[in-house]
């Protein structure tokens, strides 16, 4: 796999003692960032910024626009994600909890603002406009999702659909920086890949019934459960043992497995349409992140 310098380049913006000591950061958007970087590199869009602009050096190598676009998009995504980690209620008055909440808000604002600063330095005004519009659209979609949740009108499939659309938004505008077949396939590849990412994350959430609220499994159970079972789901502190029983009863893990398996197959069909062997190899290795665990699970089931 091609060297991926973005996490290292992001460190100067992410590693602040105050943030690290008093709150937690969301995960770096590794998969979507790798996908974007690979497609930009394949399109040959890697012109270098002007002499007046310097990205953080990694291994002494000067970086170009592919790195800049991927870096700023990743920083904005982390800014939006850390804002999502801010608790809805501020009832907890402990000094540590209050400080963590405040720093999440400030860190999110800081990461989100960095894209403007870095792109402006590089003279990328049009990219600022496109990325700003994408941020607005992502926030609009989040509001729609939260409203459906509060009104209890959300289905499990709608939850996945909405979550995927939200996570795609910041990466979609870079289609204009791509060329040829890659440009045409970018929306479908990004959608399929992001859906794999979401479904894989939802499968991992099954291991923590105590934090299942708002997940795919939660809405799946809500659709299938009886009136009495819904009361258990809606409880402020649901019994983990009862939730595990419901997950087993309504085969949440099995449904997610088949959804992810089907989505991985769709990604493979997209990959076969690419006209670059190098890019096909890059994306194949990324898809294997999702495909390999599925194969292992299937082998275990067949024993």
How should each PLM-predicted stretch be described?
Residues 1-303:
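All-alpha prenyltransferase/terpene-synthase fold signal
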